[in-house]
Curated annotation (Swiss-Prot):
Keywords: Ribonucleoprotein, Ribosomal protein, RNA-binding, rRNA-binding. Residues 73-95 are annotated as: Disordered. Signal peptide: none annotated. The gene is rpsS. This is Small ribosomal subunit protein uS19.
C-alpha cells in the first residue's frame, strides 16, 4: 500500500540536512548514508549518495528519473551467482 499523499515523502532529517548544506555551498561530494528507506526528492538531483547494502556503500548518482523512488532500490543487498552447474556438463561427456 503506497504512502498517503497528505503525509508527503519520507526522507531522514540528517540526510536532507547534508544535501541542503551541500546545495548552499554548491558542493558535490559523496554523502554516505545507511538510510535505504528515504525517498529521493528533487533537492538530491546531481548528488552522489553512497547507500549501504549491508556490506559496503554503493555510490548512486541521482538523476531526474529517480525522483519518488527509495534509495534502497538502487543498492542491491543480494548477489546472484547462478544456479549450480552440472559437474559433468562442462568438461567431458559420460560414456
Amino acid at each position: 500500500m503506497p504512502r498517503s499523499l497528505k503525509k508527503g515523502p519520507f526522507v531522514d532529517d540528517h540526510l536532507l540536512k547534508k544535501v541542503d548544506a551541500q546545495n548552499e555551498r554548491r558542493e558535490k561530494r559523496v554523502i554516505k548514508t545507511w538510510s535505504r528507506r528515504s525517498t529521493i526528492v528533487p533537492e538530491m538531483i546531481g548528488h552522489t549518495i553512497a547507500v549501504h547494502n549491508g556490506k559496503q556503500h554503493v555510490p548512486v548518482f541521482i538523476n531526474e528519473q529517480m525522483i519518488g523512488h527509495k534509495l534502497g532500490e538502487f543498492s542491491p543487498t543480494r548477489t546472484y551467482r547462478g544456479h549450480g552447474a552440472d559437474k559433468n556438463a562442462k568438461g567431458s561427456k559420460k560414456k
